[in-house]
Amino acid sequence: MKFKKGNRWTNGKGELRYKTWRTNVFKLNKGRHGLSKHYVCMKCNKKRKTTRTLHAHHIYSWEKFPNKRYTIKNGVVLCKYCHTGFHYKYKFEALENPNLLVEYIGKNKNSKTIREYIKNDK
């Protein structure tokens, strides 16, 4: 029997393993910025006290790189506006090319961190 993907299908993102990855990405974000009470969007650098309006984004896409799905360093924090903007601008190209995230974030210390991860991961 085949099952159809319904509107509640999450492609594994509802799993405890994914939620743990997401939590750890947020913790890493705080550490990168030397903060204890705030989270920071890596694009716009706005500080947030909660993760409610923040997303954990995969540098190497969830779809194309299943072996990197739960690697904590493969995650960055973007506010929902910057995250939506990234996917609107690059659409499916972003699935294949992690360097587009560096281009999108621009030249700041955050893009340097991502560039180093991509370079060291090859």
Specify the residue positions occupied by each region the protein language model found.
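Short Fe-S-cluster ligation motifs
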Residues: 72-81, 108-122
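Short cysteine/histidine-rich metal-coordination sites, predominantly Zn2+-binding motifs
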Residues: 58-64, 94-103
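Short linker/helix segments within small regulatory modules
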Residues: 60-74
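Residues immediately within or flanking Cys/His clusters that coordinate Zn2+
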Residues: 38-41, 53, 76
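Histidine-centered catalytic micro-motifs
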Residues: 54-62, 82-86
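Short, charged surface segments at domain edges that flank catalytic/cofactor-binding sites
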Residues: 2-45, 67-69
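Short Cys/His-centered divalent metal-binding micro-motifs
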Residues: 49, 75-97
